[in-house]
């Protein structure tokens, strides 16, 4: 016998579960945040707060009111960290791929912000200024690379000497079926561009936050500037 009340109850229950899941995801995307670190990179003392995390040969210095980084020979990437260590963080930075980068290197060069970095592993939001491409990726300690999300022809990605505003958030979910998974959101110029949920978040034990410039191929001579670095944490309120 067909029972309308039972069907209505099942529909209501399904809607409730779906609504709760959506609420959990939107809570991650629109979570209240508190800024705990800000560095405009305007002075020598401020730039000195950025500590090299990886890269065999990396040169650094000032460029106006920014930190300039130059990748050396036999080096694919130069990464620097902020003083902030933690699991659930958001990092933002304004980054430019400089036109002083050799032309053969420019096309494959990327700018990035990194979270949960350590022992060669990390989450990374990478932007390719000349390709208009954005990647959200995960690197493990053994060097293996997993692409969590990729977007091409992103209008918000700017070219040589132009400011790219990168922002990466990595928060572990604390309730629901995805409890313990890491929710990752990548923003370019304030717009959400890439996102993913990583159910293997425990594979990353690093806690460093930072930024980098490099290339998967030849990165020698790649130059980038970094300023307006901000690190935020979830609000407890």
Task: Describe each region flagged by the PLM.
Residues 14-25:
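Bacterial N-terminal signal peptides
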Residues 41, 93, 158-197:
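Carbohydrate-binding surfaces in secreted/extracellular proteins
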Residues 41, 227-231:
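Extracellular beta-strand elements of beta-rich domains used
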